């Protein structure tokens, strides 16, 4: 079993991911979606958490060997980022969604040295907008962001476009394609459900038609 399929399996088993193609969820954006993900739950399961953090360390060493600092996005990327930084013996910082409205007004907590090569950690990629905002904030502070890592991606075309336009490399441990494949094998969805889930990936607006 590959790392991507093992993580997909774990996410389903611990109910970090729910698949309901016949009774879709409504995302904050208004999109009707057959999938809902809350990867924060992974922190409560030591075996899954270890699998994820070791996976992150391996991927970062392979894809971004020149990394000098790890940063987590607030709030979901913070615990994973801190664990990764500890395992890799690297400095850690975290990036708020917006600057504090009191005190020094920091958006980044932790020391960012100008020109340091940074990898930003996120738990989930939908459109990529929030993590790319975090990347931009880090770069304004002088960091050289060399990539983003995340546990899971919905593989939405908008995310691919956003990362390409930003010129930021994205590496994820697992993905939507792998997850729905594993879900069918493990009996979490029917054959009809699988077809609906495939249609959602192709077009988020018309998949129910």
From Swiss-Prot:
It catalyses: orotidine 5'-phosphate + diphosphate = orotate + 5-phospho-alpha-D-ribose 1-diphosphate. Pathway: Pyrimidine metabolism; UMP biosynthesis via de novo pathway; UMP from orotate: step 1/2. Keywords: Glycosyltransferase, Magnesium, Pyrimidine biosynthesis, Transferase. Orotate binds at residue 126. Pfam families: Pribosyltran (PF00156). GO terms for molecular function: magnesium ion binding; orotate phosphoribosyltransferase activity. Its cofactor is Mg(2+). This is Orotate phosphoribosyltransferase. It comes from Streptococcus thermophilus (strain ATCC BAA-491 / LMD-9). The gene is pyrE.
